[in-house]
Regions:
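Hydrophobic alpha-helical segments involved in membrane association or supramolecular assembly
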Residues: 1-401
C-alpha cells in the first residue's frame, strides 16, 4: 500500500480511473452537494417524524436520527487518498479527498481482486506473454493473427521486397518443385534463400539504385529490412497489439512476441526474425499473383488465391472473433460498468442518508454490485489461461504437420 494512500488497481485505463476519482472528489467536496445532502436529510427526517407520530413510536425517530448521523460521520466526513495503479504501464496517480465510505471499501475490493488475479497467474506459471495482467486477453493468439497480416509499410522496403521476390524467388519456385516445397516448409525463409545456390546468381535485379545478382540482392534486402522496414513495423505493432508501456514498446514487444510465437507455433526466434519471416510470407504470394497476371497465367493466379484463402481460413475462424472481443468489447464493457458503479456513489450516498435505518440495505446492495464488477479480473485471467492452452495444441499440430 502506498504511503498515506489506499491502492486501487486499474487495468490499462489508469488515467481514466484517476479522472473518475478526481471528479468524485470534486463533486462530493462542493457546497452544492452538501446543500443537497442537507435537503435529503431534512426531507428524510420529516418523513421519519411523521411515521413515528402516526405509529406513536418516538423511539423510531431517535434511532433514525442516530443512523443518519452515524452514516454521515463515518462515510462522508473522513477523507482518504487513493493511489490509482495502472497494472500494465505501472503508472501511479494519487487522488486526494475521497470520502472514506467509497474510498476504503473500493480499495479493499480492488486489492483483493488484484491479489486473486496474481495468485492464479503465478500458479499457472505462464510466461509474461501469456499473462492477462501483462498483455490482456488472448495476446499470443493476437500476435499470430497480427504477424500473419504484416506487410511492408515503407517505400524502400516495399520496392526492394517486391523486386527481389519477383526476380529471384518466383522464377525458382515455378521452375523447381523441390525448391517450392522447401519454401513451403521453411521455418526461416530468409535463411533458406541466403543459402549458397538456392537463388540463381545469373539473374539480376535492380535494388537501391544498383543492379545486383540475386545472391547479392538477398544480403542487400536483409540490410534494407533491418535498417528501415523492421523499425517502422515495430512502432506500428504497438497500435495493432494495443500495447503501451512506460519503459518503451520495443523492449516490451521484443520479448513478448517471441514468447507468444513459441507458445502458439513452437518456434524460437527473435522479433526481427519473426518480422522478416512475416514479410516474406506476405510478399511471396502477392508477387506470385502479380507475376501470374503479367504473364497471363490465370490458373496459377487462381491457385495462389485459393491457397492463400485456405491457409488463412483457420486463423480467421479461430482468432478474429476472439481478438476483436479481447481488444474492444470486454475492456469497454468492463470499464463502463466500473465507471458507472463508482460514479453513482454520490447518488447512492444520498439514498443511504435519506433512508436512515434503511441505509444498511442500500449499502449492502451497492457494494455487492461493486464486488461483482471487481471479480472480472481473476475470472478473465482463468478464461485467458484455458483459451490459450486449448488453442496451443491444435496450432502446434498444424505447424508441425
Amino acid at each position: 500500500m502506498t504511503t498515506e494512500a489506499l491502492d486501487f488497481y486499474a487495468y490499462w485505463n489508469g488515467a481514466q480511473v484517476a479522472d473518475l476519482w478526481t471528479t468524485l472528489a470534486l463533486i462530493t467536496g462542493t457546497d452544492d452537494y452538501r446543500s443537497l445532502l442537507l435537503c435529503v436529510a431534512l426531507f428524510g427526517l420529516i418523513c421519519a417524524a411523521a411515521g413515528a407520530a402516526v405509529r406513536y413510536r418516538g423511539g423510531d425517530l431517535i434511532v433514525w436520527i442516530a443512523a443518519m448521523v452515524f452514516i454521515f460521520s463515518a462515510a462522508f466526513v473522513p477523507r482518504v487518498n487513493i493511489a490509482v495503479r495502472d497494472v500494465r504501464s505501472a503508472n501511479v496517480q494519487v487522488v486526494q479527498n475521497i470520502p472514506l465510505g467509497i474510498g476504503w471499501p473500493a480499495s479493499v475490493i480492488s486489492r483483493a481482486s488484484y491479489w486473486l488475479t496474481e495468485s492464479f497467474e503465478t500458479a499457472f506459471g505462464d510466461v509474461d506473454a501469456a499473462r492477462y495482467t501483462r498483455f490482456g486477453v488472448a495476446f499470443p493468439q493476437r500476435v499470430v493473427t497480427t504477424m500473419l497480416s504484416v506487410k511492408p509499410i515503407t517505400a524502400d522496403g516495399k520496392m526492394s521486397l517486391t523486386n527481389f521476390t519477383e526476380r529471384c524467388i518466383v522464377p525458382e519456385i515455378l521452375e523447381n518443385s523441390v525448391k517450392r516445397q522447401e519454401l513451403l516448409n521453411a521455418p526461416d525463409i530468409n535463411a533458406l534463400i541466403s543459402t549458397n545456390g538456392w537463388v540463381n546468381p545469373a539473374r539480376r535485379v535492380f535494388m537501391n539504385n544498383k543492379v545486383l545478382t540475386c545472391t547479392e540482392a538477398a544480403e542487400e534486402l536483409k540490410k534494407t529490412l533491418e535498417k528501415t522496414e523492421i523499425p517502422a513495423l515495430e512502432s506500428r505493432l504497438r497500435l495493432k497489439l494495443n500495447v503501451d508501456f512506460k519503459d518503451g514498446v520495443n523492449a516490451a514487444l521484443s520479448t513478448a512476441i517471441p514468447q507468444a510465437e513459441s507458445i502458439m507455433l513452437g518456434v524460437s526466434r527473435t522479433m526481427a526474425e519473426s518480422l522478416r519471416q512475416s514479410l516474406m510470407m506476405s510478399a511471396i504470394p502477392d508477387t506470385t499473383m502479380t507475376f501470374a497476371a503479367k504473364v497471363g497465367q490465370a490458373p496459377l493466379s487462381a491457385g495462389v488465391a485459393i491457397a492463400r484463402s485456405q491457409g488463412n481460413l483457420a486463423s480467421e475462424i479461430n482468432y478474429r472473433t476472439l481478438s476483436e472481443m479481447a481488444r474492444s468489447a470486454l475492456p469497454k464493457l468492463r470499464n463502463i460498468l466500473e465507471f458507472t458503479v463508482i460514479g453513482l456513489w454520490p447518488m447512492v450516498f444520498l439514498m443511504m442518508l435519506g433512508t436512515g435505518t434503511g441505509g444498511a440495505m442500500v449499502c449492502r446492495a451497492y457494494f455487492t454490485l461493486l464486488i461483482s464488477v471487481s471479480l472480472w479480473a481473476p475470472i478473465t485471467a482463468i478464461i485467458n489461461y484455458l483459451t490459450l492452452h486449448l488453442d496451443m495444441e491444435p496450432m502446434n499440430q498444424l505447424v508441425n504437420s
